[in-house]
């Protein structure tokens, strides 16, 4: 995957440990997300997320991405290709900076992602949102993700699994 093709509007970088402070600065201002999906973010939790993989996946399929407008980090995405099957990409995490929310920027990023993944031969994108989080549910449904009917429980919350055909 050529990450530069994920957006024609923003600079997209593969995030590393050098970017943890920037990612933390973006995430810590999104208190509503962590109200529904505890615990609250820390630099250590970001470092852990940057390395987290589902069973039987390789790091070559994981892209922890930052979207920049100029020098400003405006969005973060954890994307895993070919999961849970070879035709599906999985968004493990997506968050925009609070200063750019409700302006169509997140939806634009997701639209560009869907178009590029379709060009690469993927047929769907899967993700989950925390049940009861109205902001997340509204955003993903607005972006054509449909509930699969599958949910699973974690410590403290339930995840609603959703899918979008591309």
Question: What residues fall within each predicted segment?
Answer:
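Conserved active-site alpha-helix within GNAT-family acetyltransferase domains
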Residues: 107, 131-149
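Acetyl-CoA-dependent GNAT
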Residues: 5-10, 14-20, 25-99, 110-112, ...
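Active-site acidic-Proline motif in GNAT/NAT acetyltransferases
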Residues: 97-103, 131-132
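Conserved GNAT acetyl-CoA-binding A-motif
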Residues: 117-129
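Conserved beta-strand-loop-alpha-helix junction that forms the acyl-donor binding cleft
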Residues: 127-137, 154-157
């Amino acid at each position: 995957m050529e990450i530069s093709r994920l957006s024609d509007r923003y600079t997209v970088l593969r995030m590393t440990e050098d970017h943890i402070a920037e990612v933390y600065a973006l995430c810590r201002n999104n208190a509503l997300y962590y109200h529904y999906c505890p615990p609250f973010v820390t630099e250590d939790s970001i470092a852990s997320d940057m390395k987290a993989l589902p069973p039987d996946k390789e790091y070559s399929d994981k892209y922890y991405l930052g979207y920049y407008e100029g020098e400003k980090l405006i969005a973060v995405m954890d994307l895993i290709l070919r999961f849970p099957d070879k035709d599906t990409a999985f968004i493990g995490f997506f968050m925009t900076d609070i200063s750019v929310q409700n302006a169509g920027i997140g939806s634009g990023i997701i639209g560009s992602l869907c178009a590029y993944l379709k060009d690469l031969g993927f047929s769907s994108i899967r993700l989950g949102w925390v049940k009861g989080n109205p902001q997340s549910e509204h955003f993903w449904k607005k972006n054509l993700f449909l509930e699969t009917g599958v949910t699973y429980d974690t410590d403290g919350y339930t995840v609603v699994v959703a899918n979008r055909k591309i």
